[in-house]
Amino acid sequence: MAHLHPYPLGRLTSRILSELAAEGPVLDFPRAKLVRGPGGRDWSTTLHGTKVATPLGPAAGPHTQLAQNIVLAYLGGCRIFELKTVQLMDELVIPRPCIDVRTVGFNVEWSQELKLEQSLEEYVKASMLLEVLAASGHLGLDPGFERFAFDLSVGYDLKGIQHERVQAFLHGMLDATKVIDRLRPELPKPYRDLPFRKCISDTLTLSTFHGCPPGEIESITRYLMEDVGLHCVVKLNPTLNGPTEARRLFNEVLGYRYRIPDAAFANDPTFEQAVDLVTRLEATAKKTGRGLGVKFSNTLVVENEGDFLPASEKSQYLSGQPLHVLAMNLVARFRGVFGDRLPISFSAGIERHNFPDAVALGLVPVTVCTDLLLPGGYARASTYFQELAT
């Protein structure tokens, strides 16, 4: 995977608008794959009280770090954008290659590839660009189909999240006025004075280390709701299935040979612990007036066989189709405990054929990583809506 370099807002905007006017591909996104709306249907939903045009989005991952990533997903009909997880340690040396999607998905890359300050600017740029696109009229969107929401993600421990640099990032997303005003002069004159949204996001999905104890997860979520004022979604691990059930589903039912190490279960919450912590957090959410949900699921730790990703990494993180079954099993179990009162976000092996079923289950948002990293990229999203309409 190549190193990432932010593209100046002015040049990016000029390119997008000129390519739209020329009625050809936009950022190499095929014109025929543009999703302009439901054509009389209603695909809209809400995210913590914010109405959005569709429940689909890119999951937090390597493809949600740069402003142009978000624009491309928007062209494909995505309207809920899970932004790449950021953390205090933003100068990590990431082993490369760090992603393998030859069959299912594997990665050894678990944090942002930009500095915190760069990530803030990229997300603000992305929000501004989407508003410029809607204002331009070039996309020919159905009424209301421009509505979108950004969902933050931070990690990986309370000490890091409380650091002043991460705090500056969070508060910059809650009120981006300074960044917006600094970027306005880069825009073409007709768009400089648009009333851009100042709150880029007030919702957050918490990402924690594999092996993060339940007490730490609870402390972080309480802090984010009580002190920062964010709606929170707690991303949970497929290890909640427990070692016996996880291995039965993964190795016996699905037939995958990869080994889930005992260490993957060592410090992760059990299902019962997760139920208890979510129950307590429901009370915190009610007290603070914030929204609370859970997300299924994080990646699955498996042993790295060293045939593609660096052999120096003893573990790799699995995503894609096999994760779908493990995560859906947890959705069923959580629904058995909480009914429909607890919103569930879902990202695990979603592709065009199972997307309609996930939507029918009332999962919001339904987000995608591995499938969008395959040939066709963000344009693959348009096929999801073709399936949803049939």
Sequence positions of predicted segments:
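Iron-sulfur (Fe-S) cluster-binding modules
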Residues: 227, 365, 386-390
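Short beta-strand/loop segments at the ligand-binding rim of alpha/beta enzyme cores
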Residues: 51-57, 289-292, 334-347
